[in-house]
Amino acid sequence: MSSLSLAHYLVLGAVLFAISIVGIFLNRKNVIVLLMAIELMLLAVNLNFVAFSHYLGDLAGQVFVFFILTVAAAESAIGLAILVVLFRNLDTINVDDLDSLKG
């Protein structure tokens, strides 16, 4: 049984990144889908960090991924909280309807 090489992980990361790019360009209406695509993009980059870190034998990349995931979790929580407030005030999460500022 053959083990997975660095190229396998990099191809998987590239596929995940491409799926997130396609998700952003195809669905530009829903803010929740946009946030999920951006998070998938960040996870693809983190997968590449871990793959290179394991391949080079350096744990600094894996530790860096933990910090990135912590910041990404906080970013997601804040983004979803903003979306809840927008939905309560405007009754929509459509990107086209969020173009006006009210002071």
Swiss-Prot record:
Subcellular location: Cell inner membrane
GO-annotated molecular function: NADH:ubiquinone reductase (non-electrogenic) activity; quinone binding
Gene3D superfamilies, sorted: 1.10.287.3510
Gene Ontology cellular component list: NADH dehydrogenase complex; plasma membrane
Enzyme Commission (EC) number: 7.1.1.-
Catalytic reactions on record: a quinone + NADH + 5 H(+)(in) = a quinol + NAD(+) + 4 H(+)(out)
Listed InterPro entries: NADH_UbQ_OxRdtase_chain4L/K, NUOK/Mnh_C1-like
Signal peptide: none
Membrane topology: Multi-pass membrane protein
UniProt keywords, alphabetically: Cell inner membrane, Cell membrane, Membrane, NAD, Quinone, Translocase, Transmembrane, Transmembrane helix, Transport, Ubiquinone
Family: Belongs to the complex I subunit 4L family.
The protein's assembly and partners: NDH-1 is composed of 14 different subunits. Subunits NuoA, H, J, K, L, M, N constitute the membrane sector of the complex.
NCBIfam families, per database record: PRK05715.1-2, PRK05715.1-3, PRK05715.1-5
Function as written in the Swiss-Prot or TrEMBL entry: NDH-1 shuttles electrons from NADH, via FMN and iron-sulfur (Fe-S) centers, to quinones in the respiratory chain. The immediate electron acceptor for the enzyme in this species is believed to be ubiquinone. Couples the redox reaction to proton translocation (for every two electrons transferred, four hydrogen ions are translocated across the cytoplasmic membrane), and thus conserves the redox energy in a proton gradient.
UniProt name for this protein: NADH-quinone oxidoreductase subunit K
Provenance organism: Ralstonia pickettii (strain 12J)
